[in-house]
């Protein structure tokens, strides 16, 4: 259940497949066909599992950890009060990056920001990167499925431009 980058109060069910991709229309229709028109009360059991350590290890395996450590980076991370709070910053710290995390430890909306990694909501990250002398800033949306960035001069890099950088 997520509101993604929308203001508080907007929630929906966002279905992802096992590989992280969006469900295709056939899967959505099959799911809709099994749903009751009205909520039903079902009691049952559940169990919790701490999947974070394995997930973080998997994410870290995609990068050259030694090169990151050797670079002695300083980065600003802005999870915008959303789902990435603590996780992205902790992952970068484990890779030897000096991290200043802003807009963490609170629900998005406390500072009247929209958890969307686009202008003007990235202004605080832009300022903090320059003030801290950081080499970059990373900004995630509310459910951490999109990312924006800021360069060392405080200039915004749109999520669509990041894909071009990754592919280049």
Q: Which residue stretches match the model-derived regions?
A:
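Acidic, glycine-rich loop-and-beta core segments that form the ion-binding/anion-interacting portion
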Residues: 114-168
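General beta-strand structural signal in soluble alpha/beta enzymes
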Residues: 1, 77, 99-103, 139-140, ...
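Active-site microenvironments of hydrolase-like enzyme catalytic domains
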Residues: 1-18, 140-153
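Short, flexible micro-motifs
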Residues: 6, 23, 85, 145, ...
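Gly/Ser/Thr-enriched, mixed-charge loops and adjacent short helices
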Residues: 11-132
């Amino acid at each position: 259940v997520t509101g993604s980058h929308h203001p508080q109060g907007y929630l929906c069910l966002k279905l992802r497949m096992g590989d992280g991709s969006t469900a295709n229309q056939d899967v959505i229709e099959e799911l809709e066909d099994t749903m009751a028109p009205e909520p039903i009360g079902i009691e049952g059991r559940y169990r919790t599992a701490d999947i974070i350590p394995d997930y973080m290890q998997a994410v870290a395996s995609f990068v050259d950890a030694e090169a990151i450590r050797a670079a002695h980076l300083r980065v600003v991370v802005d999870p915008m009060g959303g789902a990435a709070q603590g996780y992205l910053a902790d992952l970068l710290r484990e890779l030897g990056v000096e991290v200043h995390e802003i807009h963490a430890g609170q629900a998005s909306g406390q500072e009247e920001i929209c958890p969307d990694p686009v202008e003007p909501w990235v202004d605080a990250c832009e300022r903090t990167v320059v003030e801290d002398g950081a080499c970059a800033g990373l900004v995630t949306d509310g459910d951490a499925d999109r990312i924006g960035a800021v360069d060392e001069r405080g200039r915004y890099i749109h999520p669509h431009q990041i894909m071009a950088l990754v592919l280049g």
